[in-house]
Amino acid sequence: DGIFVNPIDSSKLTSLESAREAGIPIIAIDASVENKDLIDCVIESDNYDAGVLCAQDMMKRMQSADIVLLKHSTVESAVSRIQGFVDTIKNYPQYKIIDSAECEGQLERAMPVMQNILERHSKVDVVMSLNDPSALGALAAIESMKRTNILVYGVDGTPDLKSLIKQSPLVAGTAAQSPIQFGRLAAKNMYSILNRKDVPEIIEVPVTLITKDNIDTFNVRGWQ
C-alpha cells in the first residue's frame, strides 16, 4: 500500500518510477531524490544546518585550521552537510580546505582515503565527515598514523561516535539526527496519505550538535 525509501543514490531510482505509475504512495526518509515528482513526502534532518553547526563549533575552538572534507557526492543529504560547513567558513580565509575525498559514507572506504590524505599533508587540523561511519574511518586512519592533533566531526549521533566523544580527545562532535523521530513522522504521514489527506512535501527535523560539553544529556547506548 505504501513504500518508505532511504535513497543511497539520489538519481538511480528506476523502481520508484514503476511504483509511481502504479499509484503507490512513497515517502523518502533521511535523503531526498532528484526527481521530487516520484515521492509524496521527504522526511529528513536539516542537513545543511548539520554542517553549519560543526563549522561554528570548530571556529569557536580554533583560530585557524587546515581542513579535510570526506564526502559522498551522489547523496543529496551528504552534499548539503558538506555545503553547510563550506558556506560557514568561506568568508574566513584562516580556515582552509586543503583536501577532500569521496568515501561513500563508509568506514572501510574512509580509512584508506584518509591515510592517503595524511601522507600528502604534514599538517591537518580538522576532518569534516559527511556522517559518523566516515568519521570513524578517519579516526582509525589518524590513530594508525599517530597524528594525535587532529579534530574529527561527524553527522548522525550514532552510539559508537557518542561513546568516543567521551573517550577520545580527537572526536570533536557529531551533529545528531533523530531516527526515532523519522520513524514516527513517516508512519504518521503515510497514514495520512492512505486516508487521502494532504501532507507536507518536505519535513525537516532539527539536528543537535553533541560535544563533550553536552554528551551527558544524551543516551550514549542508543539513538535520539
Model-derived features: positions:
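Short, solvent-exposed amphipathic alpha-helices that sit
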Residues: A50-C54, S77-Y95, R109, V113, ...
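Hydrophobic alpha-helical
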Residues: G2-R20, F85, D99, E104-S163
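Flexible loop/hinge segments that line or gate small-molecule binding clefts
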Residues: G2, S10-D49, T158-V171, N219-R221
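Short beta-strand segments enriched in small/hydrophobic residues
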Residues: G2, P7, D40-C41, D66-T74
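Hydrophobic alpha-helical segments within soluble ligand-binding/sensing domains
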Residues: V42-I67, V79-S80, R109-M111, T158-K162, ...
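Hinge/cleft segment of the Venus flytrap/periplasmic-binding protein
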Residues: S77, T88-I89, S178-Q224
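Structural detector of well-ordered beta-strand residues that form the stable sheet scaffold
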Residues: I27, V68, I98, L151-Y153, ...
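Short beta-strand elements in bilobed, periplasmic/extracellular small-molecule ligand-binding domains
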Residues: D66-K71, V86-E108
